């Protein structure tokens, strides 16, 4: 009832990192089934944090969060972080936003949309410094990505469950309907979701 658009199926995982891995694997599965086996490239962003498992660490844009263990580098493309503070050469946020959108579209054209599996983005880059992107940035990215028939993954591990005033920020705050939405943490109010069901006989004895 609360998920954006027609997102009406849930796949449970063990945490946010594995949720990201699962989302990317589902993209691979869908493309392979459709015969689009060349669509393997992933676009992400600098300063983004998507997790610590193999694939989620690979699409994370924070080098200090990447351990000495191997990660996947081939086929992962990083765009600039949507933080105006890092790029003072732009006089205003609107010009900076235009630059970021152009960068995204140029990267898609460079790689070839027929080769791109997904674009993954946090609506607000939390671990990267609580980076709030320029106004309309998320919506404009979504427009570009959908124009080129690329899967849009919204990583709402941090922003979902009313962190920004709504169950999910993608639709109500940023006006986008992602193809896949990832959430964790807030779904259990921060409690670790674990369960054991012992036999009543154990208690009786």
Describe these PLM feature segments.
Residues 10-20, 158, 182-188:
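Active-site nucleophile and cofactor-binding loops and adjacent substrate-binding regions
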Residues 114-129:
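Short acidic, glycine-rich surface-loop motifs adjacent to enzyme active sites
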Residues 131-165:
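Catalytic PLP-binding core of fold-type I/II PLP enzymes
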Residues 23, 120, 153-154, 177, ...:
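Generic enzyme active-site microenvironment
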Residues 1, 170, 197:
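Acidic-glycine-rich active-site phosphate/pyrophosphate-binding loop
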Residues 2-117:
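PLP-dependent aspartate aminotransferase-fold enzymes
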Residues 169-185:
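Conserved active-site segment immediately N-terminal to the catalytic lysine
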Residues 195-205:
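Single conserved hydrophobic/aromatic residue that forms the stacking wall/gate
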